Amino acid sequence: MKRADKVQRIAAILDECYPEAAVPLDHQDPFTLLVAVVLSAQCTDVKVNQVTPGLFARACTPQAMARLPVAEIQREIASLGLAPTKAKNLAALSQQLLERHGGKVPESFEALEALPGVGHKTASVVMVQAFGRPAFPVDTHIHRLAARWGLSSGRNVAETERDLKRLFPEVAWGKLHLQLIHFGREHCPARGHDPAVCPICSWGAPRRRSGAAGPTSASPRRGSRASAGAASPAPKARAARSARRRGRERAR
């Protein structure tokens, strides 16, 4: 199958599975989305959604977050990984929003990525989901799917993002980002995945990437002493020698 045909078929399947894919992080506006995405680093969206109601009840604006002591922010997000660092970043980025952007989340990659704790992926999510700007956020999960389906041979998320942007139309990037997140969780997980029943891997994943079993370099060669069905004589020989040695020792 030509790659263009594969891309079109994948897009059709994702549209059928998730015609209205929702942002998995609970938020109300660009600022709360930015906060939620910062908190999601090395953490599941489910856990983030468990702590943000309490945090946002106390600070849902840059002004309120900047006033809240770092220790209080950390207490609200204590169950998340990297909580001390994330708390400091939330306080610092809120202060920068007030000082440099009039208390508003900026609508540019350069300004977003200059904020504490905000990398390219976080900025991409905010740009496309909060402002509708062209962006294709790629995390390790989307990177895995792209490799599994033979859409990218990128060595990292940046290279995979580049490849996916070339394959899919710009107008679909934001939708595809969400569809891929949901599809990976529900149909194409990293572990315990059966490619035979996956709506995409079942036909679109190269055998070496689908997780299907296949021959390996460790397979025995025909005629070798380790061929299937032929037991290695070494363990039996060692056992016999040990038995003879014990017999001689008892006879002494």
Describe the function of each predicted region.
Residues 1, 205-252:
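Polybasic, lysine-enriched low-complexity intrinsically disordered terminal tails
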